[in-house]
Amino acid sequence: MAVIGVEIRDRVEFNSGSSWGNFGPYERIDGIVEFGVDPKNQANSRIVDLQYSPVDKNGLVKFSSDFVLLTPSKSKPSRLLVDIVNRGRKRAVSDFNMSSPSLIPSANIDPGDGFLFNRGYTVISVGWQYDVYRSDALLGMEPPKVEIDGKIVKGMNLVEIRPYEKIKTSLLANRSHKPYPTTSTDNLTAQMYVREWEDGPHREIPCEEWSFAKEINGIVIPDCEHVYMESGFQPGKIYSVVYEASNPVVSGSTLLSVRDIGSWLKYSGVDSPVKVPVKYAYAYGISQTGRLLRHYLYSGLNLDESGRQVYDGVLPHVAGGRRGDFNHRFAQPSQQSSPGFGHLYPFSDKPTKDPYGRKSEGLQDTQKILGGLPKVIYTNTSAEYWRGDASLSHINLEGTHDLDFPKNTRSYLFSGTQHVPRELPQKKDAGPDGSLGLYGFNVIDFRPLLRAALCNLVAWVERGEEPPESKVPRLDDTTASTIHAVLEIFSENVGLKTPDPSQMWRIREIDIGPEESKGITYYPVREGGEYPRFVSAVDADGNEVAGIKMPDISVPLGTHTGWNPRDPSTGAPNQIISMVGLTNYFPSTEVFVRPDRDLRKSNDERYSSKKEYLEMVTKSAKKLVKQKYL
């Protein structure tokens, strides 16, 4: 058993002792779990650099993770749900219990309507990301270090800087996480590049124009954790700093923490706060951690050190078709945009041929060979298709035909939605990277569909009930389309400003060097041919025709997308803001003054009355419930 100890830091009644369904009150337990893994155990053999970590007297590599556990205090839980936190933030309860969506991390847990608790779930949120600044609100981990022959380990690293306003100093890290400092403030062996758009050419910035430094009270001082440019980093441009870093950690220990926290509670291991083993365990990851779950399966890690299956069901949400920076030297777990290990083939669960020379391979191949393959339900929004990678999970890499999903897999597009659920009233604020969108953000709250996906996964695992069929854009029924074709409809029918399709995200073949198998790369990686990009086709209103259509789409009051052009104030107005969509309402009446080229019918032309509209919404919702999508 890889869990060797636990420290309970707090144990309290949850939500003032509220009782939930047939399961009674819950308790909240905050603590730190300590892992000890055997680097010689075959179950750990695919973790990069684990063999270079110090071991204790028992030959174990040790590391630890923060956790927050919610479990019935007086009854047996029905099942285990492991919430793999997103950049330190707990997400499962807010996503499934429909509490007010917020991107602001908090130590508190809003129980929402109690959806999970009324069904008896034990929910554990586990910290796994080692570069998170840990706090009461953000869960992280203490990873093992890499030590080779007693020498300092050095290697190349790349940090991306994406300013939404002009700045002179930037942290040498992805977002606001802990940086890998440069080994020297002398930048003569480092490089800084800039490109105008995601797939644009790199231009090197002369080393005389920038430095490893930061500005404090108008004084520029050398600093190993920051970069400085007197002329300023310009909003909307994409900068990359390539430099030598040192003292890497075993990044793949993140994957082991996900595996072993599930095994610990499922099988009631050492000092488990859940005294009764649970029969079924599920893992949920969103965005970054959805990609982590894809990486977990690709690495064949769903058997613990004792050879037991850990997760019976896995729900990667808004992961698209990619993996991530989770198991290589100097990995940055939050990094997802710059080409690297997370952009590598394969993208689909079923083996498919790579047209650029790699063998035919599938995401689940290793896990199938080893055993312990879970049931998997993927859920994506339109945003993951518009960033160029989601369709790679189910359309072949020549872009000529659809791929079938394996028997253990379903995949659903939530039509016309953006990366995170929103709520009314509509907002026009900053996206995840601080950039502003040109239009008001997408208002669809898709969490009722996410609930259905979890319920279907549970029914599939525990009762053998097949989930409804996958709902994704397909070539064979023309519900898959090109970005160019969809944007043309928006230009001709909807009257919205559209982004330049040549400046949008795409995934390319990449070469990361001869030491790829060792988890070592060079930067910037060499990029080759482009993989095809498909999105859902749209109707005359600009609403998507593929996927699961909530009443917002099937009985619309406006156009809803997974993309939104950048506001000119944040630079690059011909590109889209990351992860954010838009909602643009129909004219309320036929005589409503509308923009040029807006040919959409008014609400008065669509619905004879509010009563008729609500009846149509009810009918649409009931149909989705009957089909088990809602």
Model regions and ranges:
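C-terminal His-loop and adjacent cap/lid subdomain of alpha/beta-hydrolase
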Residues: A2-L630
